[in-house]
Regions:
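Beta-lactam-recognizing serine transpeptidase/beta-lactamase-like catalytic domain environment
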Residues: 3-5, 11-17, 234-295, 300-552, ...
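Periplasmic/cell-envelope proteins involved in peptidoglycan metabolism and beta-lactam response
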Residues: 1-266, 278-290, 312, 369-376, ...
Length: 575
C-alpha cells in the first residue's frame, strides 16, 4: 500500500513541476513548486529508516525537512539557470519612463558579438560589422540606398527591426553555430561569430529605383512618397524594393567607441525626428504601405473573366461612359475614352483604355462568389508567407485582414464587388503584392512565393574559406491562379496596353513590355498613381515584374509609369 501511495505522490509532484514548467509563468511555477513541497517531504520521510526513539524521530524529521527544502531550492535554481535564463537575461526594468534598467553584462556581451553581415546579390555589403581595438563591435550600413532594407540594430535603445530582427538568431550566432564549438569559445573567451545573410536584391537596380523615386514629381509638394518593386517573374525573388522617404539605420546604431551620453543623445534626437516626421519614413511603403490599387486591379478582373470562359479579348461591351448597377452608377474616367470611340468596345480595348464600365459589368455578371474566388487565389486577404516583413493586402476594411465577407454578404456587398473590380471599394494592397500579381500573369498563371533571402552561411573560416551554407531558399509556387492559356491571353492584353493603350509610354526598343496604369481615388486629396508591368526578350516568358506607386501622385500614366520606365530602361541596358 505504501509503495502505491509513494508512486502516486511521485506522479503528483512530477505533474505539478511539469505544469509549472510549461506554463512559462514565474507565478505559476512558484505556486506549483510550493504545492509540490508536501509530497516531496512525504517521499523524503518515507525513505528514511525507522527511528529508535522519539528524539531520533524528531531529529530525523527535521533533517528530512531540511533535505526537502534543499531539493526544492535546487529544482528552482535549475529552473532559473537553465529554463528561465534567457528571459531573465533579457528582462528590462524601469525607474520611470526614461530610465530603463537591464543587465549590463548582457549589453556588454551583445556589443562584442561579431554580428553576421548582410550582402546584396552581387556581394555588396548592406549591413557590416567592424571590430574595434577594445573588442567591441560597431554595426554599419555602407550604402544608404540599401541599408534601410536591413532594418536597424539598436539592442540598447529601440531593439531590432526588419531583417535585423527576423534573422537575429542567425546574425547574433545563437543559431547556426556548432554548440560544442560555442561552448569552447565561451570557456576560452573567444568571440562569437554570427552567420551572414545573402539577399536576392540587386544593388544597382535598387539604386536606380531609389533615385527615380526621389525625383518623382507629381502635384504633391514636399517629400515624394512612394515605392518601386522589381521581382524575378520566374522565381519570385525580390530584385529591388525601394521606398521613399526612407531612414538611415546607421544613425540608430550606436558607436561603442564614442562617448555613451553623446551617442545616446544623438540617437534619441534622430529617432524622435523619425517618429515625428509627418511623411513617416519608418514605414517601408513597398511592403508595409497598403493602398487602393485603382485600375491596375483590373488585371485581376480580366483574369477572372477570361479564366471562367465567359469572356474573350474580343467580347463586345456597350459603354456609353456610365452604367447603373445595383442602384449605383459607375463612371469611366473623363480622359480614358479616346475621342471618336464608343460606345461599343471589346474587352481588350476596355483594358488598354481602362474603362471602369467594362470591368464593373464583368464583376456584376460573374457575381461576388466567383470574383472572391479569384481575388483570394491571388492571395489578397491571405498571408504570402514571405521571408521578410510584409503587410497582408486586404479586400475588406475590417479588423481582420483575412476577411472577404464584405463583397459576399451585407447591404453593400454587390456595390463593393463592383467597386473592387476596378480597384476601389475597400481594397488595400501593397506595391509588392501588385508586382506579384503582374508576375503571376507573366509566369503562366502560377503565383510564386516572394522571397528576399537567397541563403544563410556561417562566417568564413580563419583560413578565408567560405562558411557552410545553413539554409538555401528554393523558389516555391503558392498556387495556380489561372490556366496557362488564360495567362497567355492576359499577357497579350498587357502587351496591347503598351502597344496602343494608355501605357504606350512604357515601350522599350528590343524588349517586349506589357503594362497597366492605375489612378486610385483616395476619398481625400489627390489620387494615388500606379503602374504595373512585365518585361522580357520573349513575349511568352517575361523576366521581370515591376510596380511603381506614388502616394497622391495623380495620374498613373503621368507619374508612376515614368518612374517604372526609368527602372526598366536601366535593366534593359545592362550587360
Amino acid at each position: 500500500m505504501k509503495r502505491v501511495l509513494a508512486a502516486l505522490v511521485v506522479a503528483l509532484v512530477a505533474a505539478l513541476l511539469f505544469y509549472g514548467y510549461y506554463s512559462r509563468s514565474d507565478q505559476t511555477w512558484l505556486l506549483c513548486l510550493l504545492a509540490s513541497f508536501p509530497g516531496l517531504l512525504y517521499l523524503v520521510w518515507q525513505g528514511m529508516p525507522r527511528p529508535s526513539s522519539e528524539t531520533n524521530r524528531t531529529l530525523q524529521r527535521l533533517g528530512g525537512t531540511l533535505i526537502a527544502c534543499f531539493m526544492l531550492i535546487s529544482v528552482h535554481l535549475l529552473y532559473q539557470q537553465v529554463v528561465a535564463a534567457p528571459a531573465i537575461r533579457l528582462k528590462i526594468g524601469s525607474q520611470g519612463t526614461d530610465n530603463p534598467i537591464s543587465d549590463p553584462r548582457r549589453a556588454d556581451a551583445e556589443l562584442r558579438v561579431r554580428r553576421g553581415r548582410i550582402f546584396a546579390a552581387g556581394g555588396q555589403p548592406i549591413a557590416d560589422t567592424t571590430v574595434l581595438p577594445d573588442g567591441y563591435v560597431a554595426r554599419s550600413y555602407p550604402n544608404s540606398y540599401t541599408g534601410y532594407l536591413a532594418g536597424y540594430y539598436s539592442p540598447l535603445r529601440f531593439g531590432n527591426f526588419g531583417l535585423e530582427n527576423l534573422y537575429d538568431d542567425y546574425l547574433s550566432g545563437r543559431k547556426g553555430n556548432n554548440p560544442l564549438l560555442e561552448a569552447e569559445n565561451n570557456l576560452l573567451h573567444r568571440p562569437t561569430y554570427g552567420s551572414d545573410l545573402y539577399l536576392t536584391l540587386q544593388a544597382d537596380v535598387q539604386e536606380v529605383a531609389q533615385d527615380a523615386l526621389a525625383g518623382c514629381g507629381g502635384p504633391q509638394r514636399g517629400v515624394c512618397r512612394g515605392a518601386v518593386v522589381v521581382l524575378d517573374v520566374q522565381t519570385g525573388a525580390v530584385l529591388a524594393m525601394a521606398s521613399n522617404p526612407r531612414f538611415d539605420p546607421s544613425q540608430i546604431a550606436a558607436d561603442p567607441a564614442s562617448d555613451p551620453k553623446a551617442e545616446r543623445d544623438r540617437i534619441t534626437a534622430y529617432w524622435n525626428g523619425l517618429v515625428n516626421d509627418p511623411s513617416n519614413p519608418l514605414v517601408l511603403r513597398a511592403t508595409a504601405g497598403r493602398y487602393p490599387p485603382g485600375s491596375t486591379f483590373k488585371t485581376v478582373t480580366l483574369v477572372a473573366g477570361l479564366d471562367t470562359g465567359k469572356y474573350t479579348l474580343t467580347s463586345p461591351f456597350t459603354d456609353p461612359g456610365q452604367v447603373s448597377l445595383n442602384n449605383q452608377t459607375v463612371y469611366d474616367c473623363t480622359t480614358c475614352r479616346p475621342a471618336g470611340t464608343g460606345p461599343r468596345y471589346s474587352l481588350v480595348e476596355g483594358y488598354k483604355w481602362s474603362l471602369n464600365v467594362v470591368f464593373a459589368t464583368i464583376a456584376n455578371d460573374l457575381g461576388a462568389g466567383e470574383m472572391a474566388k479569384y481575388i483570394s487565389s491571388f492571395y489578397i486577404s491571405r498571408d504570402l508567407r514571405a521571408d521578410f516583413d510584409l503587410a497582408t493586402s486586404s479586400l475588406c476594411s475590417t479588423a481582420a485582414p483575412t476577411d472577404i465577407q464584405c463583397i459576399l454578404s451585407g447591404p453593400e456587398a454587390k456595390n463593393l464587388n463592383v467597386a473592387s473590380s476596378y480597384g476601389q471599394g475597400q481594397l488595400q494592397v501593397t506595391p509588392l503584392h501588385m508586382a506579384l500579381i503582374a508576375a503571376t500573369v507573366g509566369r503562366g498563371g502560377e503565383l510564386p512565393r516572394p522571397y528576399l533571402v537567397d541563403h544563410i552561411s556561417q562566417h568564413p573560416t580563419s583560413e578565408g574559406q567560405p562558411g557552410r551554407v545553413l539554409q538555401k531558399t528554393s523558389p516555391q509556387v503558392l498556387t495556380r491562379v489561372m490556366t496557362p492559356q488564360t495567362a497567355s491571353t492576359a499577357r497579350q492584353a498587357m502587351y496591347t496596353g503598351v502597344q496602343s493603350g494608355w501605357a504606350n509610354g512604357a515601350a522599350i526598343p528590343g524588349w517586349v513590355v506589357g503594362g497597366k496604369t492605375g489612378t486610385a481615388e483616395t476619398g481625400r486629396g489627390t489620387n494615388h498613381a500606379w503602374f504595373i508591368a512585365i518585361m522580357g526578350k520573349d513575349a511568352g516568358s517575361p523576366q521581370y515584374a515591376i510596380c511603381a506607386m506614388i502616394e497622391n501622385g495623380g495620374e498613373g500614366s503621368s507619374y508612376a509609369m515614368p518612374i517604372a520606365k526609368r527602372v526598366m530602361t536601366y535593366i534593359a541596358g545592362r550587360k
